[in-house]
């Protein structure tokens, strides 16, 4: 038995044994350095964990989601607030992609390439459509299609609202507990 204490948000290599759904932890090993996540960063990390617990099926491998999650957690202490928000949205987008709900940010609902000079509206069931009063610029969508970092507050606000709509249909009516923490502080 190890006397090393486990830390929250620390990567572990673990092995289980047993039959059926109830398994026993047979071995664990720390796979990285402990990280200190506090305050608002802790709430963001708990939100990411809750999404994983609520949306990803047990015992299925989602290596790209894990990689995006780990990048997000590892960078929390090094980013400013806008960069953290983008890293979180990037994690959400990767998870949605892995679950089969990804978006092609390079094309509209008519399979036409996004035009950087036009405005678009988002519909969670169809995608992006040209709308002169749309909430997002084509340039923003093209930047997302190229996986470029976005730190503009207006663009981040759009991403947050868009992902909220996309996640709501998967999460159902049961609210996320981690969101309640934002209102307590």
Go through each PLM region and give its residues.
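Non-catalytic alpha-helical scaffolds and adjoining flexible linkers that form interface surfaces
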Residues: 1-185
